[in-house]
Amino acid sequence: LTVSNTITASGATGRTLTLQSDNSVIFNTGADVVTTNALQVVLNADHDASAVGAITLGVGTVIDSKGGNILLGGGATGTGFAVGAGSTSPNDRGVDLSGATLNANGGHIVIRGRGFAGTGSDNYGVYIHNGSTVQTSGAGTITIVGEGGTGTNSNQGVRIDGNSANGTTISTVDGALSITGTGGTGVGGGSGGFLRGIRFIAGRVSSVNGAISLTGTSGNDSGNDNDGVHMASQATVLSTGTGDISITGTVGGPASLVDNDGVTMIG
């Protein structure tokens, strides 16, 4: 299912827009969801649970639900995992947000993705990058769950990338913000490494009064750099009010290898 033009909803509050496919759900560059009143938005890939069906939002895509909940996932009801659908990017990621915006305006946001199970590398569960924004306000919460796939290496559960030009941000106001990532595996238990639960490079995760939780478990192979949570290049986790911050990392493979750490923070 490919969306190439903006979807506009003008009905009463409380309606639901469901985009459902047995395979992938793809928003081309600049295709948006625009609504006058609160709208529940469900992007449901891999509806037939065949383990093939990713969600990809392109550069400039904006989904603004005006207070409705936003769900990106897979399976029969969309509450399971969207699953990487091929060995080349972005299809190898369960959910890929590249320069896209999700704004629930007080509603809840849930994102669930699992990387491609096959060959290659970088089969991320959830990849949020290139200046993407995931945000809500009021008591709205954000929940992101990612599981890395199978491949040569670098099959990370959740990867967040930002830089000075493209500041990827994930934020709430009073609601909880939870990111949970589980690294995948190398082919045949290979030695590729970099099977991080959460990799967070630059960018910003923040809340005012909501609790922030980052929980990562690395994958298990005989390689190095399998961190539970890896933060670098001025990655920022910030509470500006009363919200607590919890960062928990677990090594899924041999801790005796190089840089297989629960939590790593670099500059």
Task: Write out the residue ranges for each language-model feature.
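Extracellular beta-strand scaffolds
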Residues: 1-2, 7-10, 23-28, 32-34, ...
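Surface-exposed extracellular loop regions of Gram-negative outer-membrane beta-barrel proteins
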Residues: 18-20
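Short, flexible, glycine/charge-rich loop motifs used to bind or transfer phosphoryl groups or to couple energy/partner
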Residues: 267
